[in-house]
């Protein structure tokens, strides 16, 4: 959409253009770096709205609007690569303001060209995992295959959001007889089995050489809610694990320790602590290259629900999850999910969900990986 001429001082340049290109994605020339998820039918391909960033030096009138715009002035381009299947993959190439150098995947480019070295990602925020809904093609694309995202870019740390789903005994559907019968027919009633699946997934990721940091998320916390509200006497499939985990929580409280129920569940299943895995508690900070990655994104300001625009007010750059949609608003970035809306089993109607992930480079610059047809990068016929 090169014909657009949006004022560089516009705070939300994409807001009025969601329907401008119909069902197609759009690219808007603008000095800010933003990505907005496009609204679509669940059966349609994901749609995204992008701004480009700019290559020009800032030159704003030093009054309120100009001073705010100068703060969000980003040296960046949107690079598009189209593979042999006709699928297009966008990457923001964000330059260091003092050198003009930038990262792309595992390479670092200077005014003299690529430096020829392999550069690991400092961090990767995959979309929310929801292990019990995670399909094998996505698992292979993300970390199992030799050319998977994790094995190719070798992030030092992988931030795991909503590792667990708890769809088998979720408080939102446990009183729904149809849902419970479907779970019975599919053999998906055992909570311990679902936790074991999450443990296996964490092991799969650490086997690649990356450290995993589990961000305490709303679906992980459903395990604790289950212990608070469920009646094990009417749930024989889960009674033993329920009581084992309940005893663990009461023992922790007796010692004056903070509850960390999902971690406890994983360690019971694993028979001890998981190697190279760290579990964060709610509100615990974890920084990656100057970016706050310790929040899931579900909790906002003063008890309100979390949102990407509200996190942008924090004064610290953030990487979060929760909304299952690729969203970039200035310094606040949110990743998507590792499942589609159709696979969730609970979300219906129009959607912005996407299989998208945030990569963080060692200089604090970031890139959003947009996955298509079980591909995280372009694929070419050799």
Give, region by region, the residue ranges found by the protein language model:
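Divalent metal-coordination and catalytic microenvironments
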Residues: 80, 128, 158, 162-163, ...
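Core catalytic region of metal-dependent phosphoesterases/phosphodiesterases
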Residues: 135-257
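A short C-terminal boundary segment appended to hydrolase-like catalytic domains
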Residues: 84-119, 364-382
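Conserved beta-sheet core of the metallophosphoesterase superfamily
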Residues: 5-86, 288-370, 374
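A structural signal for short, well-ordered beta-strand segments and their strand-loop junctions
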Residues: 27-28, 49-51, 89-92, 157-161, ...
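Mobile, glycine- and charge-enriched loop segments
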Residues: 105-139
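Active-site-proximal loop/helix segment associated with metal-binding centers of metalloenzymes
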Residues: 70, 230-292
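Short, flexible loop motifs at catalytic/binding sites
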Residues: 126-129, 163, 301-305
